[in-house]
Amino acid sequence: MDGESRLLSAFVYPEDISIITTAMHTFGKQATCRYYDCNRIEIHSARFESRVWPLAVISCPRRFGAEFVSVSFGNEEEIEEFREPIPLINRVYEKPIHELSVCVGPLYGNESKWLEIIEYVEHYRLLGTSFFYFTLFNMNEYDRKIIDDYERLGIAESTKYVTEYLRLGWMSHLIQTHECHYRSKFHSKWVVNMDIDERLIYTGPFNLRHYLRSMPSNIGEVSFTTNRVLKTEENPSKYVSESQLLSDLMFLKYNKTTEISWYNLKGIIRPEMVALLFYHWSFFQFEGVKVMSAPKRIGHVRHYRNIDTTALNGNWMENYDGKLRITRLSSSFEKKLIMAVRRKVKYVYDQRGIRCEEIPEWLSSRYKRELLDCKFRYE
């Protein structure tokens, strides 16, 4: 897409800076790194000539006193109207803050996401992940509430996209993949790279973190096989009741699955060891780095998908043997996940209006009823 190249995010690492933009058509072009102090004033004689690689990323050297950065291309340096500088996000640590985190695939489309997000996050929390990187393409206010709550807890952060396009979809997925890759770099040791409808199932010894700790130091990615779970209905748009919630949970509702296959594999990645991603797996690793395939007995990914010939890869059933089998999560994991999802849903979405009985008498007697945003219990 030949869209405007806007600044998305910028990260300072131990040895350099990475600036991510919103357009891939600048790939390979020359770019100028520009540095600004805490007052957003450009630092004199600090500019640096670089190039866009990979995709929409510009690498720049660090500069003393730089708190904000921007980039310019070609003759843009002489134009007064340029890209406003954005703040540098610190990624300089003695060791990664998180051992295992999740890069959540982009959230877009018309289908409601609030319950899917909760199922996703609570599933991966049970697997031992401690942080989530969200990317918000298009999201309504109701769905956004759960993202805000996870950010409130300090277990998530989100990247917001502001482009000239009314809506973003799968064609911007690669930008999300790389932005999250650079966002997690040096912040997390291992990163699960999965879409919102994908759940890693670990069936190996001990737990997932223990398994990753056993990896040789030169392993930059562990790849997992996948199977598809047939999804036949849209997600609920809003919370109705606890009984309805149990009927809507995807991991209870959908259990017709294909065989496990290496078609459309997914990966857990060491960000600082991988230079370039292709959607959910590494495409280019640094010298000496190896990719390992996890045996099927260790784990696989359950991918919940409906069949829609008009959607991207909507005819996915053609890539499997066509036989669907009933499979479920382990009973102990299911019970824990039900409890976690129920607790989070009720905390965020089980809401009511203010009751007039709750308002202190000194306040209710001072103001007229029509000014009080309340109803009596039995109204």
Enumerate the predicted regions with their spans.
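Short, surface-exposed basic-aromatic patches at helix termini and helix-loop junctions that form
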Residues: 125, 146-155, 209-216
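Active-site-proximal specificity loops/subdomain of glycosyltransferases
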Residues: 49-52, 90-101, 107-109, 113, ...
